[in-house]
Swiss-Prot record:
A factor required for optimal assembly of photosystem II (PSII) which acts in the early stages of PSII assembly. Also plays a role in replacement of photodamaged D1 (psbA). May interact with precursor D1 to prevent its premature processing before association with D2 (psbD). May also play a role in chlorophyll insertion into chlorophyll-binding proteins. Increasing levels of chlorophyll precursors partially suppresses deletion of this protein, supporting the idea that Ycf48 assists YidC in synthesis of chlorophyll-binding proteins. Belongs to the Ycf48 family. One of its GO terms (biological process) is photosystem II assembly. This is Photosystem II assembly lipoprotein Ycf48. Changing residue 219 to E: No visible phenotype. Keywords: Lipoprotein, Membrane, Palmitate, Photosynthesis, Photosystem II, Signal, Thylakoid. The last 3 residues are removed in the mature protein. HAMAP family: Ycf48. It holds the Pfam family PSII_BNR. A lipid is attached at residue 29 (S-diacylglycerol cysteine). It comes from the Bacteria. Disruption phenotype: Grows significantly slower than wild-type, 30-50% reduction in functional PSII, decreased chlorophyll content, significantly reduced replacement of photodamaged D1 (psbA). Grows poorly on low light (40-50 umol photon/m(2)/s) and not on higher light, reduced chlorophyll, increased levels of unassembled D1, substantially reduced levels of chlorophyll precursors.
Amino acid sequence: MPVKFPSLKFEQLKQLVLVAAIAVFCVSCSHVPDLAFNPWQEIALETDSTFADIAFTEDPNHGWLVGTKETIFETTDGGDTWEQKLIDLGEEKASFSAVSFSGNEGWITGKPSILLHTTDGGQTWARIPLSEKLPGAPYSIIALGPQTAEMITDLGAIYKTTNGGKNWKALVEGAVGVARTIQRSTDGRYVAVSARGNFYSTWAPGQTEWTPHNRNSSRRLQTMGYGKDGQLWLLARGGQLQFSTDPDAEEWSDVIAPQDKGSWGLLDLSFRTPEEVWVAGASGNLLMSQDGGQTWAKDTGVEDIPANLYRVVFLSPEKGFVLGQDGILLKYNPSTEVAMVP
């Protein structure tokens, strides 16, 4: 006896086939090419800290790496191996946020109210006392020359010293408020993203106040920074990237989505060369563009790293590092050819 299938089930089957076809089409559209070679070497460090910053002395092989949980590492071979160091801060539980060197003079900032100074490449570190009235906690510092540095707090208060930290001059009258991220350009400008990512502020030398700017889309801002030529860039929630098209930070390029998968969070961006861009993100996500951000490729050699990659730092086109959580550190290997596989 012939079996009759209800028409409803047949319609359901057609819908399932259609959904499957759409899914396959979307996957093919959102595919990001892979890099043929992985130019990053994972450096094994025995710590579960999240790294915040890295800097080198006048000796290109001698560097320092800092992070949470009072973490400080030193290298004397260009970053291939690292030795953990301890600095006695008493009973305070510090979280280091930045390190910077000019020659052999260096500075380290951290919470709560931590500022360290060295004049001998880090053989000895002295703690610089900070006023209890300091607006916010030290967020970052830039060594500018002998006895000279510029420090910014997490509330956007900017100070400069020219005598090794004995005295500080305020460069801005008003704070910006609690900031999510703050970055400085090579010519001394700053951009700060608000704690909730709903607006950003800019400051330039000579200005007395921060200038607030509304974000240009419904997506909350993740972080912002400056490219090699001083051009602003931004990363927004959902894995979106934009570059500024005017010096006033009011006009922006069309949205670029390095990955057409909104679930991937992008956390930092850095230029290796004027055209080669690297973007790091959650769950070992590392992407590269060779044409200034127009097309992208994914470094699948690091995608199995079970950690967020928070910072990409290129000290030169040949020397770069990726800083992550749980003690993850990647070192750029320029001898590895970088090529895209379609």
